[in-house]
Amino acid sequence: MRIVINGFGRIGRLVLRQILKRNAPIEVVAINDLVSGDLLTYLFKYDSTHGSFASQATFSDGCLVVGERKIRFLAEKDVQKLPWKDLDVDVVVESTGLFVNKDDAAKHLDSGAKRVLITAPAKGDVPTFVMGVNHQKFDPANDVIISNASCTTNCLAPLAKVLLDNFGIEEGLMTTVHAATATQSVVDGPSRKDWRGGRGAFQNIIPASTGAAKAVGLCLPELKGKLTGMAFRVPVADVSVVDLTVKLSSATTYEAVCEAVKHAASTSMRNIMHYTEEAVVSSDFIGCEYSSVFDAQAGVALNDRFFKLIAWYDNEIGYATRIVDLLEYIQGNSK
C-alpha cells in the first residue's frame, strides 16, 4: 500500500512513527505540509511527550530519511495541485483537520488518490469506522472517503459495544477529561468560536463541547440518540479519560460489568481494549497503544442498572495506532 500524509502535525507524525515502529507493509511516499521539511524532520525526531524517535531520522534533498526509507516533502496548499496520480497513491491520510467534509476530502480523489482516510470526525455523509467496533463493515468498492472518528470515540465506542452486546443500553452521558491539544492557547487569548477555549490551557480546567458520544451512533446505529456528552480540557500534555454514566437495559452488578469487559479485552477486543485493577493515574498511560483501558477500581454502581464507568486512553498514540490498524485492514480487504 502506498500512502501519503496530508498534514504533519501531532497525529500525522505519530502515525508515521507507528508505521515505522511496527515495520508495517505500508510505503509512505510523501508528506504534504506547509512547514519546511527540515523543521518537520526536527519535530518528528524530537517529541516532548513521547521522547526521541528510536532510529536515526535526517533531512536530505527535500526528503525525510529514516533508514532505507526516503519520504518526499511537499508544501502545496491547493489540494487539487498535488501529484497523487503520479505518485500512485492508494490512501491519503488526511490529518490537517481542515478537509473533514466529503466535498473537500474528494479533492484528493480529483488529484489521483484512490482513497481518503480522515483522521478526525467527518462532516456529512462519510462512513465512520472504529477498529474493534464496526471495521468489518468496510466496503472497499463503495467506501472511498472514510473517517476514523476521534480519539475519544475510539475509547468510548468499544466500551459501549461491550455494554450493548451484554446488557443493552437505554441512555448515557459521557464526560471526557481531555488533555490539552495544539489548538488551545498557552496563555489567555481571543477565541471567537469558543470564548472559554481561548483561556490558558495550563492554567485552567476548561469546559468544552464534543461530538464524540453522539458519534458512537455512527458506528453503532443501535445507540443513535442514546448517548451525548461534553469535555473538560485539563492541564496535562497527554492522556485523557472517559467517564461514562450509563443506564443499562437489563439488571446486573458492577462485578458482572467488569467481567464482561475483562472477557472482551482478552477475546473480541484484544489489542483494542485493556482491563486493569491497578491503582493507575493518567501518566501511566503515556504511550499506551490501546484505544480504551477500563479502570475497574474507578467505576461505581448506583443500583443494578445505573453505572459510572471509567476508561483511559492516550489520545495521541492510541489513536495513531488505530489509524495504522485501519490502513492495514483496508490493505488486506481491498484486493
From Swiss-Prot:
Q: Which UniProt keywords apply?
A: Cytoplasm, Glycolysis, NAD, Nucleotide-binding, Oxidoreductase
Stated name of the protein: Glyceraldehyde-3-phosphate dehydrogenase
So where does D-glyceraldehyde 3-phosphate get bound?
150-152, 181, 210-211, 233
Q: Which organism is it from?
A: Chlamydia muridarum (strain MoPn / Nigg)
Q: Tell me where in or outside the cell this protein is found.
A: Cytoplasm
SUPFAM superfamilies, alphabetized: Glyceraldehyde-3-phosphate dehydrogenase-like, C-terminal domain, NAD(P)-binding Rossmann-fold domains
Family recorded in the similarity comment: Belongs to the glyceraldehyde-3-phosphate dehydrogenase family.
What catalytic reaction does the record list?
A: D-glyceraldehyde 3-phosphate + phosphate + NAD(+) = (2R)-3-phospho-glyceroyl phosphate + NADH + H(+)
Gene Ontology molecular function terms on file? glyceraldehyde-3-phosphate dehydrogenase (NAD+) (phosphorylating) activity; NAD binding; NADP binding
Q: Does the keyword field hold ATP-binding?
A: no
Q: What does this protein do?
A: Catalyzes the oxidative phosphorylation of glyceraldehyde 3-phosphate (G3P) to 1,3-bisphosphoglycerate (BPG) using the cofactor NAD. The first reaction step involves the formation of a hemiacetal intermediate between G3P and a cysteine residue, and this hemiacetal intermediate is then oxidized to a thioester, with concomitant reduction of NAD to NADH. The reduced NADH is then exchanged with the second NAD, and the thioester is attacked by a nucleophilic inorganic phosphate to produce BPG.
